[in-house]
Amino acid sequence: MPYSEIRGVPGVPAQAVLGFLAQLTQQVAPVGIVLVAQRASGSLALAGAAAAAFSVGAGMGRPVQGRLMDRRGSRPVLAATALIHVAALLALVGWAQAGGAWWAMAVLSWVAGIGLPPISLSMRIEWGRRIGAEGHTAAYSLVYLVQELAMLVGPLAFGLLIAVASSSLALGLVAVAAGAGTLAFSLALRAGATASSRGRGRVFTDRRMLVLLAVVLLLGGVIGALQVGLPALAAARGAPAATGLLVAALSLGGIAGAAAYGARSWGFRVQARLAGLLLVLGLVLAPLVLVGALPLFWAVLFAGGLVLNPALTTASLLVDEYAPAAQAEAFGWISTSIGMGGAAGSAAAGVAGDLFGHSAPFLAAAAFALGGSALASTLLRTGRPGTV
């Protein structure tokens, strides 16, 4: 199913726009928390702990949110999380301005993470139910395209707000905008407005779901390793400002990859697609160890982004097959696995960089991708042919 047909489904264009607005804090919140907490406490370590608390909260919250969505529907979960998320961030800003204790900022950051609204999860559920199986590749690609755009635009808008105001005011404004977008998005839902009649199943009835989570964890490791490797490389080259351009290369590649991947039908089995995409990702990232010129580095990262988002899309397609009776919770576990993998990847990349130099994190990223490909290939032995 081409994108033109998906855009013709009533409500989808509005949901995509509102979903974009609602996800502005996805990337902004951790950065904003660091800036606000560091200014209040004077310690980067304490600010980092607050940001880590946000990430931990987000990882803990996703499966719970998904289970509630399976049982109660999307709207009440979105409304509740929007209020919790915005209230916690505004309380954090106020507490920091008042010079409150740092541990309370960490607690508020954790609460903000727990309440991070499950927008992309809701979009997958909504569009998956309203669009036939033949259109799921395009629908899930559009989900990641919208998310990637929000992750690209959000920090830029945040930076502009900081330039004209302050980090505290900027974080508060972005939080309010995201909260309003979430509430508007929840009202725009149609199929996801009520709980699915199937939504009381068990996530891990099919044990292949556990294998898929392990694959996605390794894919998250790729992302985490790159998050450490890119600023380290730019700093080592004496051009720390180039970090933004390198991150943008990966994001732009992800946008282009999601758009291209969803624009056509694929004849390969879904399991084979996932293994193949991760293999290509690993082979693309491995040469970064040898690349010297930053422009060439940018081009290789763009190529990596071209397959990164399609790999995430393909993992979502397998959720349709492995956990059809508890999709929202399963998607929540996918998000948690990506976050856990990101933490592991960041840690591994940091150790590799200290031991072997600033290029080593990219070898770690490639190793995560190749390991994910090998593990995904085991799904071929028991998997059924894909139908999307």
Put a short name on every predicted segment.
Residues 33, 117-131, 230, 310-323:
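Intracellular juxtamembrane helix-capping segments at the cytosolic ends
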Residues 83-99, 280-292:
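C-terminal ends and interior cores of transmembrane alpha-helices
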Residues 326-356:
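A late C-terminal transmembrane helix in Major Facilitator Superfamily
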